[in-house]
Amino acid sequence: MSMLAELVEVVIGVDTHSQTHTAAVVDTRTGGVLARATVTADPDGYAELVALAEQHSGLRAWAMEGTGGYGAGLTRHLAEAEELVVELDRPKRPARRAGAKSDPIDAERAARDALAR
């Protein structure tokens, strides 16, 4: 079985909430964060995230938890656009405490967790 990093050039980790979604675009080769964005959790925001992803060439995957909850609308939008979405388990509490809690950090963590699979 191939690891995600062998299949795509970037992973977009998304931290989903009821009003906003925060994303981090991570380069699979270098591990560097190429871009970050926070958008509204609505169709306009989803389109902004796809536009952000399209600024980075190559194959991509999206990683998020809550695809059936706060991330459901974004997940549907991405599925309609034929984007690859990886659903993550909620991080264990100690992992969440290992550093400051912030949406940008959680978005980056989502991308890195997907790459570790």
Regions found by a protein language model. Name each.
Residues 1-117:
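Phosphate- and other anionic-substrate recognition elements at nucleic-acid/protein interfaces
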